[in-house]
């Protein structure tokens, strides 16, 4: 994790968060709900908690386990799966927790996100820094892509379109140091779990936030991402200067655990392409995204193999 030299920081931090979520989910079911507002708050907190637990286990599974493979998921080990608030202790065991298989972990992630969608159907308010129905739907679509369940991915993502908007880079104000892509007014942003680090850690100038000259040169000259996100300098790498705010102040919008509309379009295109029977729909979503990124873009037709 950035900002720490301790290799266990991410592991410890995420399990601490999961422990709080487990307690929250158990306690809110003991509440005596009387008013409509109390019921709405209950569903909002439940939906947010389930979304976050699913998100955190997805991160843990990908950081510390193998990539999901449907053929081996029932035997591939991931991380310990803890979904209760109690403290277990068995004096006869050398270790209190064992690694769960990937199929069990992903099944729990799927269950949490589906349950969060149900909760959000009773409390639909959307705030950038809070989980929402749109955030849960997009994250679950990503999970289904990991699981190679293309039809499920397509079906869960489809209701998003019409309720999300792409940010156009081919019209309007040019991005600059005073007008960054990642900001609270960008309608493309669906969810941002803002950074806990001061913004100085996320300036986009550090070496780990640079892209190679080779990658930079792959962008077409009409692709606005080439100039909007990157500053061209006389080195072998380029800083993502116009994507992040710079300066030493508390972070707000951050791409750490961010969800935005562009991913929905890419994920939908991937799901349709991988189905092998819906190339037309895959092209539709990919072309719509690129029309908002490349000046004078002409729609392309690709096959699933491409």
Give the ranges of each region predicted by the language model.
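Conserved, well-structured interaction surfaces
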Residues: 1-65, 100, 113, 117-123, ...
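Short glycine/proline-rich turn/loop motifs
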Residues: 1-5, 88-95, 238-253
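Short coil/linker segments at helix-helix boundaries
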Residues: 40, 63-107
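TPR-repeat structural position
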Residues: 106, 150, 278-279
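Aromatic- and glycine-enriched pocket-lining scaffold segments that form the walls
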Residues: 120-154
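Hydrophobic-face positions in mid-chain alpha helices that act as interaction patches
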Residues: 130, 152-262, 295-300, 304-306
